[in-house]
Design a protein with these regions (language model features):
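Sec-dependent N-terminal signal peptides
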Residues: 4-13
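Charged, low-complexity intrinsically disordered terminal segments
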Residues: 16-313
Length: 313
């Protein structure tokens, strides 16, 4: 059976990776390792203590329309809980439809918890204001800010929650590049069409995403949510659908080199092609070196960036 590996890079974690493990893997000549790109990175992540599961079904959602149709349908089917963690919920048509649906699920007895980053909310042009949060909470939805601003504000600049996680009944999870906003479907006047991707996951990796959500939720709210109801057993996937998933979750000032090295090793070990899609392509020195050496080996390297950016600099 040919395994397909999905490596999901998230922000914020309590993981720690030994520098000597990273360096030892990175300094080995590629040919001497004798591994494919997938297995090389998988070995690196295992040595680094990253949670890896091989009993998963993964669906790639290649547009905002696909993501929100799939997510909303999964929420409609929720029986026990819905957990949402995003950098921001933009106060627009998508968020309004989402909170309306969540309020309906609360009436059915479903637990709904939502968390967003304080800076992410403040920095978007349609933030959730106090009156909006009050209405949401009155409908029985628990919603909290991650790391609200307190003086001195500069102390909170780097420690932000950029995760995009949804977990429904501990059975289905979503993660990827999209927050909650209608511009993932409609685009923006000055920018145009918005290209991003997301993933739907069923299987053991859902537990890893649930653990990430509940760790931060319990820390922020001083609650103690957990137990079997949030971590159900998952059905065994067949060989034809079984996907290996590694959840890479990091915090500022921790594991700062790990993601760069994981990307670099994937590029170094590529044999046919490397395709990169990134709107904010600012490669580190290790990524630049990996790309140059890979090109020198005759591997086709294609990089797609935005023709117009939402960042003014």
């Amino acid at each position: 059976m040919k395994l397909r590996i999905f490596i999901l890079f998230l922000f914020l974690s309590l993981l720690h990776v030994q520098a000597d493990v990273i360096d030892s893997l990175m300094t080995q000549p590629r040919d001497s390792i004798g591994l494919t790109s997938d297995s090389l990175v998988l070995h690196f992540l295992e040595e680094s203590g990253i949670p890896i599961s091989d009993n998963n079904k993964v669906k790639l959602l290649k547009s905002g329309r696909e993501k929100f149709i799939d997510l909303f349908e999964a929420i409609r089917e929720a029986k026990h809980h819905v957990h949402l963690e995003y950098f921001n919920f933009r106060n627009d048509s998508i968020a309004n439809a989402l909170f309306t649906l969540l309020a309906e699920k609360v009436k059915e007895g479903v637990e709904v918890r939502a968390m967003f980053d304080a800076f992410g909310n403040w920095s978007n042009n349609k933030p959730l204001k106090k009156k909006h949060l009050k209405k949401i909470r009155e409908q029985g939805i628990e919603i909290v800010k991650f790391d609200p601003f307190t003086f001195p504000y500069i102390n909170h600049a780097a420690h932000r929650d950029h995760r995009k996680i949804a977990v429904i009944d501990g059975k289905v999870a979503y993660t990827g590049g999209m927050n909650i906003a209608d511009y993932y479907i409609n685009g923006l006047p000055k920018i145009g069409t918005w290209r991003d991707m997301h993933m739907r996951i069923e299987g053991d990796a859902v537990n890893d995403l649930q653990e990430i959500f509940l760790t931060i939720w319990n820390k922020e709210t001083k609650q103690n949510i957990g137990g079997e109801a949030y971590f159900p057993q998952h059905e065994e996937q067949t060989d034809s659908t079984n996907i290996v998933v590694a959840i890479v979750d990091r915090t500022p000032k921790k594991n700062s080199r790990m993601l760069s090295h994981a990307y670099a090793m994937s590029i170094y070990s590529a044999q046919k092609n490397v395709h990169i899609v990134n709107p904010y392509f600012v490669p580190t020195s290790s990524i630049k070196k990996a790309l140059n050496r890979t090109i020198d080996r005759g591997v086709d390297v294609t990089i797609m960036v935005s023709s117009a950016s939402d960042i003014p600099f």
